[in-house]
Swiss-Prot record:
Family assignment from sequence similarity: Belongs to the GHMP kinase family. Homoserine kinase subfamily.
Listed name of the protein: Homoserine kinase
Primary gene name: thrB
SUPFAM superfamilies named in the record: GHMP Kinase, C-terminal domain, Ribosomal protein S5 domain 2-like
Subcellular location: Cytoplasm
Length: 288
């Protein structure tokens, strides 16, 4: 059995802590034979435990404490602490591991409630579960999610060589916004969501780049951001935004412009990797 969970890109500009999309990088968990102890084989970051201390197993045991230990093989091309939902993918995989091994028969909505309680907000875990574009909210123990197709566009991701942890990225945000600022910020977010749902990427792109909630505070933490945005816009992009808490920079591109923008960014002397990504429409799935 193999559990597959997509990467996710959250916020998408003004959709702060509430909007995310599933993308074509993946965490895969191969569930192998029963074992005396939990064993997680991987060639990932050496900081990631290879026993029951692994977050994947911790999550599974929270839901089903009596499941028999297994040998697991973990592979992932979702980079750690880069704003592509690496921790959310593990949380969703852990829930699915318990769901499969303990035969919990959880619905997607039940998975979402559990994942949101663990993660604190649904913007990454929701698209990891459902796939596609998800607009979600969590308030007073109530979680809501609306799943929609993402408009016809490509994603070009610049993933820097350096990490930017969410806690650091949140420290630069203001403690409060004035009433006037909040109204302006929410109106921009409303336009961005409406345009995405309608499929109008030109209007969506302008709104995405006009965010007032977080981007202007975080952009100075990512030294390549302004150059990428300038080059992408000059060559016909819809928008450039910070993926999640960063430092990944995401360019939304018309499909006929993607190759030009991708090649142009490849020629720059940026210290990181550049990928063309597509929307994942399935979310978490199990191959048996």
């Amino acid at each position: 059995m193999k559990i597959i969970v997509p990467a996710t890109s959250a916020n998408i500009g003004p959709g702060f802590d509430s909007v995310g999309v599933a993308l074509s990088k993946y965490l895969e968990i191969e569930v192998l034979e029963e074992s005396q102890e939990w064993v997680i084989e991987h060639d990932l970051n050496p900081r990631i435990p290879k026993d029951r201390r692994n977050l994947l197993v911790k999550i599974a045991l929270q839901l089903a404490p009596d499941i028999q230990p297994r040998r697991l093989k973990m592979t992932s091309d979702i980079p750690l602490a880069r704003g592509l939902g690496s921790s959310s993918s593990v949380i969703v995989a852990g829930i699915e591991l318990a769901n499969q091994l303990a035969h919990l028969n959880l619905s997607d909505y039940q998975k979402l409630k559990i994942a949101t309680k663990i993660e604190g907000h649904p913007d990454n875990v929701a698209p990891a579960i459902y796939g596609n574009l998800v607009v979600s909210s969590s308030s007073r123990n109530q979680v809501s999610a609306v799943v929609a197709d993402f408009p016809d566009a490509d994603f070009i991701a610049y993933i820097p060589d350096y990490e930017l942890r969410t806690v650091e990225s949140r420290q630069v945000l203001p403690n409060r916004l004035s009433y006037k600022e909040a109204v302006a910020a929410s109106s921009i977010a409303n336009v961005a969501i409406a345009a995405l749902l309608k499929g109008d990427m030109k209007i969506a792109g302008r709104a995405i780049e006009s965010d007032l909630f977080h981007e202007k505070y975080r952009q100075p933490l990512i030294k390549e951001f302004s150059d990428i945005k300038f080059l992408a816009r000059k060559n016909g992009s819809y928008a450039t935004y910070i993926s999640g808490a960063g430092p990944t920079v995401m360019v939304l591109s018309p499909k006929h412009k993607t190759e030009t923008i991708y090649q142009l960014l490849q020629k720059q002397n940026f210290k990181g990797q550049i990928f063309r990504l597509q929307v994942d429409t399935e979310g978490v799935r199990v191959e048996k």
